[in-house]
Swiss-Prot record:
Ranges in coiled-coil conformation: 38-68
Protein known as: Uncharacterized protein C1orf122 homolog
Source organism superkingdom: Eukaryota
PANTHER family: RGD1559909 (PTHR41401), RIKEN CDNA 1110065P20 GENE (PTHR41401:SF1)
Organism: Mus musculus
UniProt-annotated stretches for the region Disordered: 1-41, 65-110
Pfam families the record matches: DUF4726
Keywords of the record: Coiled coil
Length: 110
């Protein structure tokens, strides 16, 4: 039972990774990296920059929505409803031959 979870192997050893070379680049040397604090600061700066970009994008979208709202003060549904409010929709659609039953009637007459 040497292979069980209690065999005393670390995860790196179990995966065939030599503990001394874990995370090392070619030639056994670590890849060049800035010190940990400097790297953390770089990541924090990148996150803050991305956050500013997203906030700018949101602000631009909100401005576009405001401009669209000024151009079209009436909702899209309200414009369509007011155009048809005087007549029932059924006769106007059937007069244009838009209903499937009209297409069937036309085919039987010819």
């Amino acid at each position: 039972m040497e292979w069980g979870p209690g065999a005393g192997w670390s995860r790196g050893e179990a995966a065939g990774v030599d503990r001394g070379k874990a995370g090392l680049g070619l030639g056994g040397r670590p890849p060049p990296q800035p010190p940990r604090d400097e790297r953390a600061q770089q990541l924090l700066d990148a996150v803050e920059q991305r956050q500013r970009q997203l906030l700018d994008t949101i602000a631009a979208c909100e401005e576009m929505l405001r401009q669209l709202g000024r151009r079209r003060p009436e909702p899209a549904g309200g414009g369509n409803g007011s155009a048809k409010s005087g007549a029932p929709p059924q006769p106007s659609v059937s007069a244009r031959g838009g209903l499937p039953k009209d297409a069937g009637d036309g085919a039987s007459e010819s």
